[in-house]
A protein has these predicted regions:
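Acidic (Asp/Glu-rich) sequence patches and key acidic residues
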Residues: 1-122
């Protein structure tokens, strides 16, 4: 199960969460792309998370977004050592192959977002 939480910003700077739950059979690019287009048009906040592992994308610039895509691609091509070294600096733990389904979805989301201004592992 993958939860994608989209936070809509209100006038008083509060955020209201809208959660989309994706089962394994829903890991299709068109579903993720449709969600990403909605996020992109709102230009607010995207949080993608699975269990304790989460990634925030809030106002990313193109350079950092490209780096995020590269991390996903490295996982998908099983260049795990480079990814583990990078991610251990950020979250103090390595990423294993059980996260690959998550990364497939994440890659499609990132590919559909276009430019944003901020990206970070949490």
């Amino acid at each position: 199960m993958l939860d994608i939480t989209f936070y809509k910003k209100q006038n008083n700077d509060n955020f209201v969460p809208c959660i989309i739950e994706l089962c394994d059979e829903d890991y299709e690019k068109i579903i993720v792309s449709n969600f990403a287009k909605r996020f992109h048009s709102e230009k607010q906040c995207l949080i993608v998370e699975e269990e304790e592992y989460s990634i925030d994308a809030v106002y990313c610039d193109a350079l950092v977004l490209e780096e995020a895509k590269e991390i996903c691609n490295r996982l998908l091509f099983e260049e795990l050592e480079k990814v583990q070294n990078y991610c251990s600096k950020i979250e103090g733990e390595t990423i294993n192959k059980s996260k690959l389904n998550f990364m497939f979805v994440l890659r499609d989301v990132l590919s559909s977002l276009g430019e944003c201004q901020y990206f970070s592992y949490v």
